[in-house]
């Protein structure tokens, strides 16, 4: 069994924010793969389905980003999951737009959603880091992630969300390198190759 967690803030005010790309991804995973209707559970919204013959719960915490760990802990305890069973999809400013990297454990690079999850369940869960780019200076980061994607960005955002959802079964099977590869090649084929910049996070 796997728990897929999309990070974001609840409500229409935030739904187009860069910080909410995790919500966008799990919404598309549930839609594309015919998961059950969303319902209120675990201090958030949850849906359930099957990927790669494995039961998968997708969760969108309704606790706001800074308290995401409360919802994740509820689900982990209910299903008696290990950290390795948890996959968190989140925005990553230290990656260029449209770039995706998967990592296990490590630093949180100031991401309050990850900080909360690590405080509640430990640090050795898997993270799917969805590049949204950096505004250039630290002082602009808060506004950058809490602003909507620009109109000019929407085409690559839609392509990335679709591509990640399409290949989500590889994450269930813990084939993280294959997942990264598939997403990269698919985005290239769609004309949205990342800029090749190396990530700055451990």
UniProtKB/Swiss-Prot annotation:
Gene Ontology BP annotations: protein quality control for misfolded or incompletely synthesized proteins; rescue of stalled ribosome
UniProt-listed Enzyme Commission number(s): 3.1.1.29
Residue numbers binding tRNA: 14, 64, 66, 112
Keywords, alphabetical: Cytoplasm, Hydrolase, RNA-binding, tRNA-binding
Stored PANTHER family: PEPTIDYL-TRNA HYDROLASE (PTHR17224:SF1)
Subunit structure of this chain's protein: Monomer.
Protein name in UniProt: Peptidyl-tRNA hydrolase
Source species taxonomy: Bacteria, Pseudomonadati, Pseudomonadota, Alphaproteobacteria, Hyphomicrobiales
């Amino acid at each position: 069994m796997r728990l897929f967690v999309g990070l974001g803030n609840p409500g229409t005010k935030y739904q187009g924010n860069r910080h909410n790309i995790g919500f966008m991804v799990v919404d598309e995973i549930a839609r594309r793969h015919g998961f059950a209707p969303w319902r209120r559970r675990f201090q958030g919204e949850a849906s359930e389905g099957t990927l790669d013959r494995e039961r998968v719960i997708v969760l969108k915490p309704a606790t706001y980003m800074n308290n995401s760990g409360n919802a994740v802990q509820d689900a982990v305890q209910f299903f008696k999951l290990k950290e390795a069973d948890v996959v968190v999809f989140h925005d990553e400013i230290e990656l260029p737009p449209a770039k995706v990297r998967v990592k296990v454990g490590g630093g949180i690079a100031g991401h309050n959603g990850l900080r909360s999850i690590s405080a509640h369940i430990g640090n050795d869960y898997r993270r799917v880091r969805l590049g949204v780019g950096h505004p250039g200076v630290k002082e602009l980061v808060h506004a950058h992630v809490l602003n909507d994607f620009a109109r000019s960005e929407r085409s690559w955002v839609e392509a990335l969300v679709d591509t990640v959802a399409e290949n989500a079964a590889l994450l269930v099977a813990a084939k993280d390198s294959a997942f990264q590869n598939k997403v990269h090649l698919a985005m290239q084929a769609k004309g949205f190759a990342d800029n090749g910049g190396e990530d700055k996070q451990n």
